[in-house]
């Protein structure tokens, strides 16, 4: 199911965070995110957030063998918590069913989703071969969000466009979705996946599925 390390960056982008399988998102048409203005990545706070993520990923990749899987997980846990609004992403991925869940169920889903996401990064970013992770520009969206455009350049010259949708939370900017090749929404994919599980087994089945995925990734498989 998963590729070798040489393909890890591109597969990671395809699977949230793989970054695993997550173009319309958040229940609105993509047309609502029409660009208003372009910015270079230098002074933009949303771009700075993604730059911090990429700096941390490169550091972990270069130290991957010394850190080991658990060490990579521990290093990336605080970085991903600051980069992504994982509670909001969990709620959006669950969709309309969210309001019917109990508070403990909501917390269990957020915890399991966060763990699975972090485990995915730790599992896949397991070495460095000269890849380049580049933040290009930020595009203001009409609803106040920002789209941070980036690319991943493999050593063989393969280029993957990877865009991050960021939203302001208080005084901070957090990523709420990732778009592969500029259009494929990670959250939209997650929402479809979660809906199928919720329909067949309810919230407890979703929690179990997320925990199972996290367990598998943290075992290195």
Each language-model region and where it sits:
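Sec/Tat signal peptide C-region and signal peptidase I cleavage site
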Residues: 34-42
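Early exported N-terminus immediately downstream of N-terminal targeting peptides
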Residues: 43-121
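Surface-exposed, polar/charged faces of alpha-helical domains
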Residues: 44-48, 59, 63-71, 100-104, ...
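Bacterial N-terminal signal peptides
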Residues: 23-35
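Short beta-strand edge/turn micro-motifs at domain boundaries
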Residues: 159-189
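N-terminal secretory signal peptides that target proteins for export/translocation
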Residues: 1-18
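Surface-exposed, charged secondary-structure patches
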Residues: 118-160, 210-221
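Low-complexity, intrinsically disordered terminal/linker segments enriched in charged
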Residues: 179-221
């Amino acid at each position: 199911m998963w590729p070798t390390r040489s393909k890890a960056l591109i597969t990671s982008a395809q699977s949230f965070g793989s970054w695993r399988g997550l173009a319309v998102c958040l229940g609105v048409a993509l047309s609502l995110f029409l660009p208003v203005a372009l910015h270079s990545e230098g002074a933009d706070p949303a771009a700075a957030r993604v730059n911090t993520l990429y700096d941390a990923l490169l550091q972990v990749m270069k130290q991957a063998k010394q850190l080991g899987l658990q060490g990579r997980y521990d290093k990336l846990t605080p970085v991903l918590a600051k980069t992504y609004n994982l509670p909001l992403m969990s709620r959006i991925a669950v969709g309309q069913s969210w309001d019917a869940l109990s508070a403990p169920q909501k917390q269990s889903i957020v915890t399991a989703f966060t763990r699975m996401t972090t485990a995915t990064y730790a599992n896949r970013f397991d070495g460095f071969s000269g890849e380049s992770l580049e933040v290009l520009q930020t595009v203001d969206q009409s609803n106040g969000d920002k789209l941070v455009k980036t690319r991943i350049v493999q050593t063989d010259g393969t280029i993957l466009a990877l865009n991050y949708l960021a939203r302001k939370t208080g005084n901070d900017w957090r990523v709420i979705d990732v778009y592969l090749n500029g259009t494929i929404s990670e959250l939209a994919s997650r929402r479809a996946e979660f809906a199928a599980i919720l329909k067949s087994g309810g919230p407890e089945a979703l929690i179990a599925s997320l925990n199972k995925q996290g367990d598998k990734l943290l075992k290195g498989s």
